[in-house]
Amino acid sequence: MAKINEEQVRHVAHLARLAVTDEEVQQFTVQLEKILGFAEQLNELDTTGIEPTTHVLDLKNVLRKDEVRPSLPRTEVERLAPDWEDGQVRVPAVFE
């Protein structure tokens, strides 16, 4: 059975920017081990003769034809943007 430790849970929580308590880390460690155990049961299935799939339903993406259409004038975009710098919209940093 797959093992997951508290350090791994803390690492994933950090990546997801989640603040977790020591109690939550212990709880999530147990829960994630159970989830991984259920997923490992799939390895026991005999899939001989079954074609691999990426989607359960055979759905197709419907795309429209690209058409050139007028957009907002640059002056309007500048007026609507919260911050503008060197000809580009300035946004808050996403990554540290």
From Swiss-Prot:
Subunit structure: Heterotrimer of A, B and C subunits.
Xref: Gene3D superfamilies: Glu-tRNAGln amidotransferase C subunit, N-terminal domain
Name this polypeptide is given: Aspartyl/glutamyl-tRNA(Asn/Gln) amidotransferase subunit C
Disulphide-bonded residues: none
UniProt record similarity statement: Belongs to the GatC family.
Gene Ontology MF annotations: asparaginyl-tRNA synthase (glutamine-hydrolyzing) activity; ATP binding; glutaminyl-tRNA synthase (glutamine-hydrolyzing) activity
Function per UniProt: Allows the formation of correctly charged Asn-tRNA(Asn) or Gln-tRNA(Gln) through the transamidation of misacylated Asp-tRNA(Asn) or Glu-tRNA(Gln) in organisms which lack either or both of asparaginyl-tRNA or glutaminyl-tRNA synthetases. The reaction takes place in the presence of glutamine and ATP through an activated phospho-Asp-tRNA(Asn) or phospho-Glu-tRNA(Gln).
Source species of the chain: Exiguobacterium sibiricum (strain DSM 17290 / CCUG 55495 / CIP 109462 / JCM 13490 / 255-15)
GO process annotations (BP): glutaminyl-tRNAGln biosynthesis via transamidation; regulation of translational fidelity; translation
Catalytic activity, as annotated: L-glutamyl-tRNA(Gln) + L-glutamine + ATP + H2O = L-glutaminyl-tRNA(Gln) + L-glutamate + ADP + phosphate + H(+); L-aspartyl-tRNA(Asn) + L-glutamine + ATP + H2O = L-asparaginyl-tRNA(Asn) + L-glutamate + ADP + phosphate + 2 H(+)
Alphabetical keyword list: ATP-binding, Ligase, Nucleotide-binding, Protein biosynthesis
Cited InterPro entries: Asp/Glu-ADT_sf_sub_c, GatC
EC number in record: 6.3.5.-
Upper classification of the organism: Bacteria, Bacillati, Bacillota, Bacilli, Bacillales
PANTHER family: GLUTAMYL-TRNA(GLN) AMIDOTRANSFERASE SUBUNIT C, MITOCHONDRIAL
